[in-house]
UniProtKB/Swiss-Prot annotation:
Encoding gene (name): murB
Organism placement in taxonomy: Bacteria, Bacillati, Bacillota, Clostridia, Eubacteriales
Native source organism of the sequence: Clostridium novyi (strain NT)
Name this polypeptide is given: UDP-N-acetylenolpyruvoylglucosamine reductase
Active-site annotation: 177, 227, 297
Record InterPro entries: FAD-bd_PCMH (IPR016166), FAD-bd_PCMH-like_sf (IPR036318), FAD-bd_PCMH_sub1 (IPR016167), FAD-bd_PCMH_sub2 (IPR016169), MurB (IPR003170), MurB_C (IPR011601), MurB_C_sf (IPR036635), Oxid_FAD_bind_N (IPR006094)
Enzyme class: oxidoreductase
Broad class of where this protein is predominantly found: cytoplasm
PROSITE patterns the UniProt entry points to: FAD_PCMH
Length: 307
């Protein structure tokens, strides 16, 4: 465990006391509803504070983890050592002409709704994706034939030298669930989306239709991290899992959803270990049946529990 008292003192030089908490259970901050405690959990409310926290961590060899909405993260039962930097206070979003500018902690659904209010089309696919802007840009999030790379103009990030820089769409090097941000460990502060003027009712109709399809086909009533696995080249992960006879397979309260086999869900009291063990069952079975390697889309972080 990180010596929290020493680091707390350093963090208090740039953060307000209420922006620093200790031993916070991560299950309360992830959509899977699992995860042990973070040593230190901070909620900076400005870019300079984020930059300062990261600099303190680097100077003191303290590991840090950037947390958005926690919707694509699986935190192990032992929790996270070091500092978790939550972006939930950095959530401003506004439209300016044909563009929408959003801070990293803004929910994608809020970004889509902001576009709708200004009759801007292009972000309908993002309505209903549970993530925030930072994670969405980092992973080039997408759904229903839309993805971030189609609409992003630029992103402001903290680079590895601790500098705040602006990256163009080309510099972001977005590909399937990947980007220069993910490769280099940059931290997203905000993003600008370039959209088109459209018909308000048509935009709302598409958003409503996609939400209806999500509710019909996805187990939104249970905690999950959305699609657990990346799409293998030439295949669909959900179909491979279903054709392997794995629907309804469970380890403890972790289950392969009967509604959508691409989702692993928490039926109530699953531990992170239950979910991780189920991931291994799925990967092993699909490999044996189809000789296809499944890779997780969800980010797995933290320490194993000592119990």
């Amino acid at each position: 465990m990180v010596q929290s008292i020493d680091i707390n003192k350093k963090l208090e030089s740039i953060l307000d006391k209420e922006e620093i908490k200790n031993n916070i259970l991560m299950k309360n901050y992830t959509s899977f509803k699992v995860g042990g405690p973070a040593d230190i959990f901070v909620t900076p409310n400005s870019y300079e504070k984020v930059k300062g926290v990261i600099n303190i961590c680097k100077e003191n060899n303290i590991p840090y983890f950037i947390l958005g909405n926690g919707s694509n993260v699986l935190v192990r039962d032992g929790g996270i050592r070091g500092v978790v930097v939550s972006f939930n206070k950095l959530n401003k979003v506004y439209a300016e002409g044909n563009k929408v500018i959003a801070e990293s902690g803004t929910l994608l659904s809020m970004v889509a709704n902001t576009a709708l209010k200004s009759d801007l089309t292009g972000l309908e696919f993002a309505h209903g994706i549970p993530g925030s802007v930072g994670g969405a840009v980092t992973m080039n999030a997408g759904a229903y034939n839309g993805e971030i790379s189609q609409v992003i103009e630029s992103a402001t990030v903290i680079d590895n030298n601790g500098k705040i820089i602006k990256l163009s769409k080309e510099e972001l090097d977005l590909s399937y669930r990947n980007s220069i941000i993910l490769k280099n460990g940059y931290v997203v502060l905000n993003a600008t989306f370039a959209l088109q003027k459209g018909d308000h009712d048509a935009i709302k109709g598409r958003m409503d239709d996609l939400m209806r399809r999500r509710k019909e086909k996805q187990p939104l009533e249970y905690p999950s991290a959305g699609s657990t696995f990346k799409r293998p080249e030439g295949y669909f992960a959900a179909k491979l899992i279903e054709d392997s006879g794995l629907k309804g397979t469970h380890v403890g309260d972790a289950e392969v959803s009967i509604k959508h086999s691409g989702f692993l869900i928490n039926k109530g009291k699953a531990s992170a270990k239950d979910i991780l063990d189920l991931i291994e069952v799925v990967k092993k079975t699909v490999k044996e049946k189809f000789n296809v390697e499944l890779n997780t889309e969800v980010r797995i972080v933290g320490e194993e529990s000592e119990n």
